[in-house]
Amino acid sequence: MNQHYRDTRKIDPTKGALLPDGTPNDNDRVEIGPTQLAFREWENAGLVMPNLERMREYRWTRLTQHIVDRDLGGLLMFDPLNIRYATDSTNMQLWNTHNPFRAVLLCADGYMVMWDYKNSPFLSEFNPLVREQRSGASMFYFSNGDKVQQAASTFTAEVEDLMRTHGGNKRIAVDKIMVAGLKALEARGFEVHEGEEVTEKARAVKGPDEILAMRAACQSCEDAMHVMEAYARAEIPKGGISEDDVWAVLHAENIKRGGEWIETRLLASGPRTNPWFQECGPRICQNNEILAFDTDLVGPYGICCDISRTWWIGDAKPRQDMIDAMKHSVEHIQTNMEMLKPGVTINELSANTHVLHDKYQAQKYGCLMHGVGLCDEWPLVAYPDKHVAGAFDYPLEPGMTLCVEALVGEVGGDFSIKLEDQVLITQDGFENLTAYPFDPALMGEG
């Protein structure tokens, strides 16, 4: 049987010129995205696909409006996730977090310019909203040595020229910039404003296609979790399986679906779950003990799925104190979730939180909720004893997405329970985007 070139050049030969998300069905395209496995699973789950062209335009429009609303001439971004939000393009994302070679300037008139690695200007050409591709934004010592100031002067001269044409003033917001870059902007007479305030608030309210993309990413994350759970339950009782072995499954399954990375190493077993935040390591998991994790997973479309589960692995029943802690954790996140609706303020969420038992207070989580999108995002909802007056005086809005947290463990104990669900604020309440079940044995049902 002949295989035609028109089929071999497609990512999915069964589809037409476009994939279900509206992107080119071109096997050799530059743009990254979900794999056929992800699309099949989403179709089987009955999910509606996002349209990425609309999603990109929504983000660009929203960022531009936030610039105009603040009477800024432009927004200069170095954070790779802000660049992803503005352009939907990627380039060595983790390397870029500590070597800021990329920059994007979005001007008040919507004109957007990307400075990329000199050998890869093509990585954002798929998005027509990026009007120019340049290079030369690197202002870090590894790249420029003792000529950092010279590099900063050259780069900021380009920014000044663009702002003169497209900005209308010299008020510029900047998210994260090297010291030499900040000094060079100020030397050119720019009035520098806090860029993260702009980007975080713009990113906080998701558009319709972003919400569809998040549903898809959450489905892929949970599909990967199911594979990891099956592996853990089958292999740990046999012996010789490390925490790293289990965690590697989630990484692999994420990548198989077109996901991108995992932000943390928060998987621990047995006594290493208390205190929480011990990183996944070489410990050999034991039969009849707890395994807890927090996904912090950046999946398809660069969307973060940040959920936590705690499993009981073994053939015996968990202790009653473990069951009690698990039920208390579920009560905590479900009760707090019921407060969520448009108009409720961050301060009200803090003040009215479900109160953990005294024995769990010392080791409770760092927040009771936080925003989520491309990663953990604004806002943060603090517990009352960590609440800072004036830090988050804002109401919830439809389209915001939050993660609702619980960490329950006693000081000096031999286990912790970690739970977390991802939630969408709707027009009249909330929708829990997380379908993954709680462990029945720890719920006392096994």
Where are these regions (language model features)?
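Active-site neighborhoods and metal-handling regions in enzymes and metal-associated proteins
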Residues: 1-446
